[in-house]
A protein has these predicted regions:
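Left-handed beta-helix
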Residues: 1-184
Length: 184
């Protein structure tokens, strides 16, 4: 049992799953884990893709690089993208040439091309410093992030965002961008 009551402990628990011999060993012969799987195809790893120390779920397509990460079902990671130390939940799309460091990305998120996440100083989140911390980028479900933006550490983003939401193309470390429920 592990307490995952914070984003930091949730991230740590997922990173422990990809240890050589994880504390919570998914491969124990005497303690099998049974799940009812969806009927989806196996994951696809392109010939020139790179994957190391990661869990890649069924239905996922990887054309870029994935390092030390946990990737959910049905995710698409496009060519040139580099994912490090991150958790990406099901049905999300990561754009071409994105660089994502230490992020938790929820379900059904679309990230445009040439996006960089996890840059800058490790300063506390201004809105909820006890929640959005640990140097993580946190992206809520059904969020859209436009192409060509940079996102700092200890940030939170939710909703359908546009380039205008990123002054100078940047969401600085410690900032929160909440567009949930907004309509045009």
């Amino acid at each position: 049992w592990k307490d995952v009551g914070t984003l930091g402990s949730y991230w740590e628990a997922n990173m422990e799953l990809i240890d050589i011999i994880p504390e919570f060993n998914l491969y124990e012969e005497f303690w099998k884990i049974y799940t009812k799987g969806d009927i989806i195809p196996p994951q696809y790893i392109a010939a020139d893709a790179v994957v190391d120390r990661s869990i890649i779920s069924e239905g996922t397509e990887v054309y870029g690089e994935v390092h030390n990460s946990v990737i959910g079902a049905g995710v698409t990671i496009k060519k040139g993208a580099v994912i490090r130390d991150s958790i990406i939940m099901k049905q999300s799309v990561i754009g071409e040439n994105d660089v994502i460091d230490k992020a938790i990305i929820a379900e059904n998120v679309t990230v445009g091309d040439n996006v960089v996440m996890g840059i800058g100083e490790d300063i506390p989140n201004k809105l909820k410093p006890n929640v959005y911390s640990f140097g993580l980028v946190t992206v809520g479900e059904n969020t859209v992030i436009p192409s060509d933006v940079k996102i700092g550490k200890n940030t939170a983003i939710v909703g359908e965002t546009t380039p205008e939401d990123y002054p100078g193309g940047v969401l600085e470390s410690g900032e929160t961008l909440n567009k949930e429920g907004e309509t045009e």
